[in-house]
Amino acid sequence: MVKANNTMFQFYLVMMDFFGKYLSEKYSQSNYIEDTKHYQTVIITKIVQMFHSLELLTKNTLDEVSARCLLRSLLDCVTTYSFIYQRKDENDMLFRHYLYALDGWREYKKSVITILEDNEYKDKEDYGCDYVINQIEEKLKKHIYYAKDRVTANLLILNSNWKYESLQNPRSLKYGEMYSAIGFTNKSIDYFQGYLSQFAHGLCLSNKPTADSEQMNRVLYECIPIADKFIQTMNQTFRDKRMIDLFLRTDDIKKFMDSKGFSFDDLAEFAHALIRKDKTLLI
């Protein structure tokens, strides 16, 4: 089972690489904060690279702690991406997108720029930080949500709160609640918040004896639900039929099936992954 799922992980990597390249070329460089499609490609590129780094860790080291810390980081990155951008309401998605960007720039200003001495080297982003923050705030104040409920919108802007539950209940969700909101099962959430947290926060289980290769393989096995959610989010966010058609026609699939590690015994596992219980398809 572990081998089959690790082979499936390799297939997911092939899929991610293709989708990431296709979307990055289609939605190329943009300087407009409201260009959410391009911004998503930046996030997607980052996440795909993290999946590749996880593979390298599990193949080339026995560093289970670093691998599981990276797995937890991947989980949070995929959760954030899905929580913000996989929404039926375009207005809600755009408002959260602005708040997410505002949160990042404000944190950059607070944590990086303000501690630099005047004679230290500064990136051009350092000098333009206030300008960018002001531009994002202006976008938020022109959004339909601001006209609809100015008091709540101002509260969300003040706290850069892209994690809000709803305009009617603007409290900030915790990550465990966001895991649930994007569709992870309670069993998966218990694993994320329990077992993975032991490694991410330096708790007792992170001090166990050195892992073996089988334990490292299990990290990829446990990564499958996260990779699955990531691919599902890309497809449901962009809804690009041409991307799927091109992928299914590409030589990448044939190369993967011709690779040394592939076994036709794994096809049943692929079927379970690509066709869900509710008869929906991953791609």
Model-assigned labels for residue ranges:
Residues 69-76, 91-100, 212-222:
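Amphipathic alpha-helical scaffolding segments
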Residues 1-38, 105-244, 249-283:
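Secondary-shell segments that build the walls of catalytic and ion/ligand-binding clefts
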Residues 67-69, 85-96, 242-248:
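Short, glycine/acidic-rich hinge or "gate" loops at secondary-structure transitions
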Residues 78-89, 203, 238, 242:
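A generic secondary-structure signal for well-formed alpha-helical elements
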Residues 87-117:
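Extended amphipathic alpha-helical segments with heptad-repeat/coiled-coil character used for oligomerization
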Residues 62, 89-90, 210-211:
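Residue-level detector of alpha-helical recognition elements and their boundaries
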Residues 22-87:
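Long, hydrophobic/aromatic-enriched structural stretches that serve as scaffold segments
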